[in-house]
Amino acid sequence: MNHPSELKYARTHEWVKIEGDLVITGITDHAQDELGDLVYVETPEVGSQVTAGEQARVVESVKTASDIHAPVSGTVVEVNTDLEDDPDFVNEDPYGKGWIYKIKPDNIADVEKLLTNAEYEAGL
């Protein structure tokens, strides 16, 4: 499994990358591998509030549907509209083309409360 060291991780299998005053998030390589081929990614609405640890949306695969949780609290400022036509980007490149949404966090310091890649991998 690939879990880049420059990212932070939630126990619920989401990753976070800081980009200026925003955070980009998606599901981890482990999560996409467990789900199998994704067929649908439901993204949150731009402008909606998300709360850390709570369900933000759902991904559906040929095997099952799974909740996506918000890794930090904040406002959704952008979603990856490419996933509407190509949800398999999450399987092919979960940390690149497969990002799901961007959040303007209520407190950027909350990212530091998330797991390192070593801590995340130890919990798998």
From Swiss-Prot:
Coiled coil: none annotated. InterPro entries: 2-oxoA_DH_lipoyl-BS, Biotin_lipoyl, GCV_H, GCV_H/Fam206, GCV_H_sub, Single_hybrid_motif. Residues 22-104 form the Lipoyl-binding domain. Gene3D superfamilies: 2.40.50.100. Signal peptide: none annotated. PROSITE patterns: BIOTINYL_LIPOYL, LIPOYL. CDD domains: GCS_H. Keywords: Lipoyl. The modification N6-lipoyllysine is found at residue 63. Pfam families: GCV_H. It comes from the Bacteria. Binds 1 lipoyl cofactor covalently. One of its GO terms (cellular component) is glycine cleavage complex. The keyword Cell cycle does not apply. Its cofactor is (R)-lipoate. The keyword Cell inner membrane does not apply. GO terms for biological process: glycine decarboxylation via glycine cleavage system. The glycine cleavage system is composed of four proteins: P, T, L and H. HAMAP family: GcvH. Belongs to the GcvH family. The glycine cleavage system catalyzes the degradation of glycine. The H protein shuttles the methylamine group of glycine from the P protein to the T protein. This is Glycine cleavage system H protein. It comes from Acinetobacter baumannii (strain SDF). The lineage of its organism: Bacteria, Pseudomonadati, Pseudomonadota, Gammaproteobacteria, Moraxellales.
